[in-house]
Amino acid sequence: MVQKITRSLMCCVLFAMSVVASFAADKLMIVGDAVWGGWTPANSVVMLPDGENVFKATVYLKKIDGETVKEGFKLLTAAKWDCLQYHAGDSDVELEEGVAAQLYDNQENGNDKKFQVKESANYDVVCDLNAKTITATKSAYQEHPVNHNALWMVGDATPGDWNFGSLTPMTQDSENPMVFKATTYLKVGEMKIAQNNDGGFDQTFYLRDATDDTKVVFGGDDNKWTITEAATYDVTVNLADMTIDIKKHYADFVVDHLFVIGDAIWSGWGFAN
């Protein structure tokens, strides 16, 4: 009797562990003809973690038009097809704004149907892999299409060199989702900007304009930014006007007071005097 109970408990534990394992993910990204990168995994839209097995993104989603958008989107856990995926299950699902829809992973359901939206717009998308739900709500920001929630600097000028396992993140501005910033030490060398931290060198990069170092282009010739002096820099990218600003940290700092201290003067080492 004890052995039977023990076996049953072990089976329950193993089943629970397998279910949790199938839902767990270190990364989640949106792929499909409803997003800018289409069906290219290296250009899928990276979602950011927002708790254990919860991911969020603000992203421009396009409605089905029968021409450029025929299917919608689904979710990948890596920038490749051979990975755990999440989709709509047995039939395509048109998401109701603010209403959670069920997620199905490709290990339990192989029908691979897609999610769709009624209107092209920026959406705040939340995927809860614990509850296996996806929710899309129209974003307050609609001025420009939002295609990324973070960017990453890569190159021998960065601390991580050309290693995609050690990218330098650029954080999205809380007030303007088209602006990304980083304060980081840069070495003498070159760099460019990735939009997918799992996409490797097959993805489309943000690159230096061939005629203007302060301008950014998306894709094209592999022109990089050159850092000529090692220092800590503030780097700001604005995708609304496709510009980049690279300046030394504290370059704008203005000193308006100096104080003399020491035993060579009357007040000695006293800060108050």
Question: What label would you give each PLM region?
Answer:
Residues 1-12:
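Bacterial N-terminal signal peptides that target proteins for export
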Residues 19-24:
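Sec/Tat signal peptide C-region and signal peptidase I cleavage site
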Residues 25-66, 78-101, 144-187, 196-221, ...:
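Aromatic-rich carbohydrate-binding modules that target alpha-glucans
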Residues 65-69, 110-124, 129-133, 223, ...:
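Short tyrosine-centred short linear motifs in exposed loops/low-complexity segments
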Residues 74-76, 126, 192-194:
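Extracellular recognition modules
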Residues 139-143:
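OB-fold nucleic-acid-binding modules
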